[in-house]
Regions:
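Cysteine-nucleophile protease catalytic domains, especially the papain-like/related folds used
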Residues: 2-66
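Residue-level marker of positions within ordered structural domains that often coincide
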Residues: 37, 75, 114
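Noncatalytic regulatory segments and standalone regulatory/sensor domains
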Residues: 63, 81-154
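Short, hydrophobic/aromatic-rich beta-strand segments within well-structured domains
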Residues: 68-71, 108
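Generic short beta-strand segments
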Residues: 71-77
Length: 154
């Protein structure tokens, strides 16, 4: 229990959460960069890539075994709208079944093919339809808030 509390406090020092707002992507990138500097890790993080480059950047990060943090941002510019992005689970027959909807949530991309991103959310495996993600971003959100934390070598 003590180590868990210690870990939580350490994380809070790098990643402060803004009450009622959460953590915007730029604040996540700033916390990761602070962690890299303190640990003398020769990497740099920034939030956001051009929409047309997102799939290439995700692929490159996965190939280099760099964690890909994907923000499925809130509705933008009006965050209290209720539009969400579907997460899918893959059944034993290899078909994708709708599981739950998300917005204003970070997930970790662990794999990608032509149609789906394999993601982890709270330790569970899901899939995001790549075209549905683009549609969500373009119609209900924005690449300003729905994007990746791009990590690369300095």
């Amino acid at each position: 229990l003590f180590r868990s509390l210690e870990c939580t406090e350490t994380m809070r020092s790098y990643f402060p959460v803004i009450p009622f707002f959460g953590m915007p992507g730029w604040l996540l990138a700033a916390g990761i960069n602070r962690y890299f500097r303190c640990g003398r890790i020769p990497l740099k993080a920034s939030f956001g890539v051009l929409g047309r480059n997102i799939w290439n950047r995700i692929s490159a990060m996965l190939v280099h075994d760099i964690p890909v943090i994907l923000a499925v941002g809130p509705n933008f510019p009006i965050p209290h709208k209720r539009h969400k992005l579907m997460l899918y689970e893959k059944n034993g027959r290899g078909t994708y079944q709708p599981s739950m909807e998300i917005s204003a949530h970070f997930v970790t991309v662990t794999g990608m093919d032509e149609n789906y991103m394999k993601v982890s959310s709270w330790g569970r495996e899901y899939y995001i339809d790549r075209q549905e993600f683009l549609n969500y971003v373009r119609k209900y959100s924005s690449f300003l808030v729905s994007n990746i934390c791009y990590i690369r070598k300095k």
